[in-house]
């Protein structure tokens, strides 16, 4: 084990007596590394009350769990003194971005994340000009990556691989068949489902028959349909959820980054949760994920009218409808809190609000948006109500996500899980530690159908995190979005230390495949 553990935490040659010792002897015979977590507060990911325990890891799996009172006996296992710290399954991020072939996920490991879910919002990581993920998946299999990866098939990628132009609304039967065949291939390769980005080009142009055709393919493999829905505006969200459910069935529908833009208060949140619960009462396994921040992060294309989005000739729009576009943008930004409510995250205005950037350029903010164009910037949009979002966040059927990636200028990419522990568990007591961990581990594992992750039990994969909840800190802010979380002492991925002593120490991640 790493040099960063203290002598008290490293007590070589001691494991529990009896059956635990026999596991260690077997591990030595197989020349597999064995590690004993001794006297930890085991929070196992099921929601069960935490309990003091000893946990033995052999190779990449958890091999034995015993009472902390078990007596020690000599063995080759290395021992980590838990000292009552929480030992939990590694966190499973339900909505992630980036590419482990090119990006470091150290900041994710720093907040206890051991598995990310890529292919979100209809688009995946860099998968080559042929738009086929097979070569990318093979490259991840060969590479040394620092985190586990679950991959979704991207709706945008499927469309383009099938030769469907971005602007097409109605697909002909041949186009539908090509998309379905490509999706079937990706599901057979191990994709966990499909993702949609229906508020973005080209998903914004897709219609229900196209989505339903894909849902049937996903259902054959027991996969999930995750969606950045058609609209997250408060007056349109129920219609968007309806579309997600009806177009996914018989596959399982899942709401990505559950939110209500412009919605206010606990009452409205309860209405939305009741709306979702009604589907579940009817036997539809509708789930959702959410991050604990009131600002989203996306491109400024979301501010523009559909008629000004690609593949429309933007120059022609400016020549013919500039004033109409300007009026639309002013109305849109006014409803979304004004130019102070958009914090730009990309050059050359990174770290400035739209109001500040416009002042710097000496122009009205609407004119700056027009100058930038739909694809000209991304940023944090402060459009959500904390009371409403927190009410959604603590619901038992809502798991957690970052919707973040390496280098993103939003604190959710570096602070989500630390914030959940620091604020929602320790400070505000909105969640018990057992429930917070279940929603970060067991629940997402159930949604993705990961039978051997998200739980601490004999036979499960050894993705583990060791920490004292009272010492966890989410250090990132909107001003300093890259500060790593603190307080997660050891993060283990597939039985090997991945993060320890405040830095990444291993590359034991794997590309996971649906079964």
Which ranges hold each PLM region?
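Histidine-rich, glycine-flanked metal-binding segment
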Residues: 14, 30-35, 42-90
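Divalent-metal coordination cores built from histidine and acidic residues
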Residues: 85-87, 94, 102-196, 215-216, ...
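Active-site neighborhoods of metal-dependent hydrolases
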Residues: 152-153, 157, 161-173, 179-200, ...
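Acidic, glycine-enriched loop/beta-strand segments at the rims
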Residues: 42-54, 379-384, 388-389, 428, ...
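N-terminal secretory signal peptides and thylakoid transit peptides that target proteins
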Residues: 2-17
């Amino acid at each position: 084990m790493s040099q960063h553990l203290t002598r008290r935490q490293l007590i070589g040659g001691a494991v529990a007596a009896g059956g635990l010792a026999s596991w260690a002897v077997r591990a030595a015979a197989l020349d597999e590394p064995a590690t004993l977590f001794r006297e930890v507060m085991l929070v196992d990911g099921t929601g069960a009350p935490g309990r003091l325990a000893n946990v033995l890891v052999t190779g990449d799996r958890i091999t034995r769990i015993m009472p902390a009172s078990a007596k020690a006996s000599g063995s080759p296992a290395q021992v980590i003194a838990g000292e009552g710290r929480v030992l939990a399954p590694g966190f499973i991020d339900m909505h992630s971005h980036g590419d482990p072939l090119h990006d470091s996920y150290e900041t994710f490991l720093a907040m206890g994340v051991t598995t990310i879910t890529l292919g979100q919002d209809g688009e995946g990581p860099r998968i080559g000009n042929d738009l086929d993920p097979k070569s990318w998946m093979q490259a991840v299999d060969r590479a040394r990556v620092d985190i586990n990866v679950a991959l979704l098939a991207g709706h945008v990628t499927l469309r383009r691989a099938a030769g469907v132009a971005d602007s097409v609304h109605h697909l002909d039967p041949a186009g539908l068949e090509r998309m379905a065949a490509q999706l079937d291939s990706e599901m057979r390769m191990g994709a966990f489902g499909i993702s949609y980005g229906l508020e973005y080009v080209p998903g914004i142009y897709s219609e229900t028959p196209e989505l339903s055709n894909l849902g049937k393919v996903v259902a054959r493999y027991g996969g999930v349909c995750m969606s950045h829905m058609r609209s997250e505006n408060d007056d349109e969200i129920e219609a968007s959820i309806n579309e997600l459910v009806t177009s996914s069935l018989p596959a399982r529908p899942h709401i990505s980054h559950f939110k209500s833009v412009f919605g206010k208060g606990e009452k409205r949140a309860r209405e939305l949760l009741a709306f979702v619960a009604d589907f579940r009462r009817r036997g539809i396994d509708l789930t959702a994920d959410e991050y604990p921040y009131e600002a989203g992060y996306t491109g400024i294309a979301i501010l523009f009218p559909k008629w000004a989005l690609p593949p429309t000739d933007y120059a022609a729009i400016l020549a013919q409808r500039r004033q109409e576009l300007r009026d639309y943008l002013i109305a849109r930004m006014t409803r979304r809190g004004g130019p102070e409510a958009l914090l730009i995250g990309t050059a050359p205005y990174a770290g400035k609000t739209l109001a500040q950037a416009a002042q710097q350029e000496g122009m009205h903010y609407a004119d700056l948006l027009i100058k930038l164009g739909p694809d000209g910037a991304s940023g944090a949009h402060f459009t959500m109500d904390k009371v409403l979002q927190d009410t959604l966040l603590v619901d038992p059927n809502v798991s957690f996500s970052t919707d973040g990636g390496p280098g993103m200028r939003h604190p959710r990419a570096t602070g989500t899980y630390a914030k959940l522990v620091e604020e929602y568990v320790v400070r505000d007591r909105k969640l018990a530690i057992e429930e917070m961990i279940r929603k970060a581990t067991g629940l997402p594992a159930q949604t993705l159908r990961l039978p051997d992750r998200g739980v601490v039990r004999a036979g499960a994969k050894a993705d583990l995190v060791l920490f004292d909840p009272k010492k966890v800190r989410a250090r990132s802010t909107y001003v300093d979005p890259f500060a790593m979380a603190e307080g997660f002492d050891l993060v283990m991925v597939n039985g090997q230390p991945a993060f320890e002593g405040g830095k990444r120490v291993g590359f034991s991640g794997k590309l996971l495949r649906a079964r």
